[in-house]
Amino acid sequence: MQVSEMKYGERAIQEGQLITFPNPRPGRQYTIEITLPEFTCKCPFSGYPDFATLYVSYIPHEKVVELKAIKLYINSYRDRYISHEEAVNQVLDDLVAACDPLYMKIKGDFAPRGNVHTVITVEHHRQTESLC
């Protein structure tokens, strides 16, 4: 069996990080909506692939997540054994850690498997400092 070198796309996914840039309109609340139709991971019980469309909606604070970085980050799930619930929650945790948004919602709409259709929705609301 021939051992092949890592392909450039695999290397980009492995080295990818969630990159942010300054919000160009920090004084205005606006919503960024991103659709990621090719999310894949593996079932931690069977090893079968799971497919989903992820919908990300957020109101940025001081930082915005760069789109190519999100794509590479999402592609890193392809070979991970992770449940639907944990996958969507982990994506939320990682994106919130990267950009600290005012608000973020992620919906994972997983393709039916075994006659079961799963949709997982998670939200984050930025904590504001108490006035007291």
From Swiss-Prot:
InterPro entries the record matches: GTP-CH-I_C/QueF, NADPH_dep_7-cyano-7-deazaG_red, QueF, QueF_type1
Active site: 43, 50
Keywords: Cytoplasm, NADP, Oxidoreductase, Queuosine biosynthesis
Pathway linked to the protein: tRNA modification; tRNA-queuosine biosynthesis
Keyword Hydrolase carried by entry: no
GO CC terms, sorted: cytoplasm
PANTHER family assigned to the protein according to its UniProt record, in alphabetical order: NADPH-DEPENDENT 7-CYANO-7-DEAZAGUANINE REDUCTASE
Protein name as catalogued: NADPH-dependent 7-cyano-7-deazaguanine reductase
Lineage: Bacteria, Bacillati, Cyanobacteriota, Cyanophyceae, Acaryochloridales
